[in-house]
Regions:
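FIC/Doc superfamily catalytic core
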Residues: 1-179, 183-306
């Protein structure tokens, strides 16, 4: 609808999420965009020197003529994403985490280096970030802490977006592997978003500093990381809109659904497929406009055209 923007800030949106999952599994344009950008940005955050064009070259032509470890990790990230899609409906386990990390490091110089213990958990202490690095779980405690983490979140049932982010913080603070923890953890977040009907996202390298600050300050100010990742969600939702993933969710369909909440920035309404959040760029939805979503949408459109 002209004059409105649909975003999904962690709400359950089962119908649209089914579409996103199907688009990715079917290797459509959204799949290609996600593969290239996810591999490029997630590896770049961890120090890869590959350009975006080189990442595309590896994806399209399997060209590994650049720095071998960087090229292999880009190629492996594509394979890791495919593995995640193949197992998206399976519960997360320690064994799956290990398999994810093994796929990422396969064929690299790390694979046969006993210091990195690829195929198992870390054997020496590590940290997050190169500058102002903060400590992580000791190697001897990794399995115990992972067991506790998995049990805690499995007991929650359906996870909210904040639950998924909290799980990621806990996983990164454990830092269970010798290398590749950030990329493995971000792939787990993508999987958990698809599993729990939350819009997934690709963390952009430009926001690396905000991401690391959010991880470090989570206990004191959750909004640092939440706001950073909610912004990434908005970017991915916009990409989905460009590929017409949400094209059938127009005013005619939404007009039949019940508004359950509203404030100065959004209308939250309920459908048979879950909760939707319609954002209208700071347009206030008045009390008299809450009878049905059709009136609210027409009001937003009218206000933005005046």
């Amino acid at each position: 609808m002209e004059g409105t923007t649909t975003v999904f800030h962690g709400t359950n949106i089962k119908g649209s999420m089914t579409r996103i999952k199907n688009e990715l599994i079917s290797h459509t344009d959204l799949y290609v965009w996600t593969q290239i950008n996810f591999a490029y940005h997630s590896n770049k955050i961890e120090g890869s020197k590959l350009s975006k064009d080189q990442t595309i070259q590896i994806f399209e032509a399997n060209d590994l003529t650049m720095d071998l470890d960087d090229a292999l990790e880009a190629q492996n990230h594509f394979r890791l994403f495919d593995y995640m899609l193949e197992t998206v409906d399976e519960p997360l386990s320690k064994e799956m985490m290990i398999q994810m990390n093994m796929i990422l490091k396969r064929g690299t110089s790390y694979e046969d280096n006993p210091a990195y213990n690829v195929g198992g958990f870390k054997v020496r202490e590590n940290g997050i970030g190169m500058i102002n690095s903060f400590k992580t779980t000791k190697p001897a405690d990794v399995e115990t802490e992972l067991d506790a983490l998995l049990e805690k979140f499995q007991n929650k049932g359906v996870l909210s977006f904040e639950d998924i982010v909290e799980f990621h913080v806990c996983f990164e603070r454990i830092h269970p592997f010798g290398d590749g923890n950030g990329r493995t953890g971000r792939m787990i977040m993508f999987k958990q978003c698809l599993q729990n009907n939350c819009i997934p996202f690709v963390l952009l390298d430009r926001d690396r500093a905000f991401y690391l600050r959010g991880l470090k300050e989570w206990d004191f100010e959750r909004n640092y990381l939440m706001d950073t990742l909610l912004t990434q969600q908005d970017v991915y939702a916009s990409v989905c809109e460009q590929f017409d993933i949400f094209k059938d969710f127009g005013q005619k369909e939404l007009s039949k659904n019940k508004i359950v909440d509203e404030n100065e920035q959004y209308v939250l309404f309920e459908t048979d497929e879950g909760m939707y959040q319609l954002v209208a760029d700071d347009q206030i939805i008045g009390e008299t406009e809450k009878n049905n979503i059709k009136d609210a949408l027409e009001s937003i459109t009218s206000k933005k055209s005046n």
